[in-house]
Amino acid sequence: MCGLVGFLGGDFSNGHVNNDILQKMSDQIVSRGPDSEGIWIDDSLRVGFAHRRLAILDLTSAGHQPMTSQSDRLVITYNGEIYNSLEIRDELVKIEAAPIWRGHSDTEILLAGFDVWGIKDTISRCTGMF
């Protein structure tokens, strides 16, 4: 099971999300995801995510998180498994809305669905645990 931490808003005296704090938070959950780690920060939104990955489906670096959609509109840090992710991927290809796939992670498929159908409609198509 992957691990994720982050924060939103708060009082940042220097106006920036502190990367060192996110790193320390991430270090506390290293056992949750020993395969890779990633940090994403957006100072303008005052939000930061850190992710510790336990690679299950896509063992390559293409499944690295936090992950940004190909549209660059969305960022996700996610834990779970979408059992029907290949069917969702096939549906995106069928309607000619699929991005250029970087790998085979269900996270990438979720992001592509979010870009096409929105979050609520994409989640309603998913079977799994997340």
Regions found by a protein language model. Name each.
Residues 1-130:
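N-terminus-centric sequence/structural signature that marks the extreme N-terminus
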